[in-house]
């Protein structure tokens, strides 16, 4: 064997040994019905149509859920509807100073004393368009949709880092974030999309995966839809509204091990709204 060949052999051996510690075992994907088994999820503002659907889908996948909402009465009713795998806590997203205490309380609601998954589900529209937007409307939308989301994510991710929990954070954005933003709602949801990218880059070194889902029109009370109404609509290419359960099923996958390599992405479930049609 020549000197050159021997040197190459030694170099190859050195790097093979050096990289042994970085070997990642291949894990076979789990049965979807158990994707979130033994996980505890905090669903922020989980008393609305999408929040309840996400909670139901999470429980079907094996998770326990903690529902938060501004109205204690709504939280109580939602938890009663969801059953034994659910707990509730009142959190006002306009009162950031309470977040640390509220998150600590939420952690203690189940014997596991932990939070593995955070879903930021809050969203308010505001009914004023550019040119007539009041400061009060602007602040109300931004405080709920963006400011509250930012600080809740900061607090829960700090907890995950401290406890070395390789968790998942899922932000609920909107297909409206892809449109030219001239309302507080569109601007706030565009901010959520941007923050999702930044938080993902900041937290992935700790094994915390951050992504977002962006619904288009969904058949919920926010859009004046109720059970029994038609899903048909002319306003998007798919010609129908999404159902809350479709959002919930996608959310399950997004916070499961199946999406550990999806980092900082926003999944659009919009029927083409915002992606191929503005």
Where are these regions (language model features)?
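Active-site helix of classical SDR
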Residues: 153, 188, 196
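Substrate-binding pocket helix/loop in short-chain dehydrogenase/reductase
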Residues: 129-130, 134-142, 232
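Alpha-helical segment proximal to the catalytic Tyr-Lys
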Residues: 158, 201-205, 260
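Non-catalytic terminal and boundary segments that flank Rossmann-like NAD(P)-dependent oxidoreductase
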Residues: 1-38
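Short C-terminal tail/terminal secondary-structure segment
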Residues: 26-28, 263-278
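Conserved glycine-rich cofactor-binding loop
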Residues: 47-48, 71
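Residue(s) in the substrate-gating loop at a strand-loop-helix junction
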Residues: 174
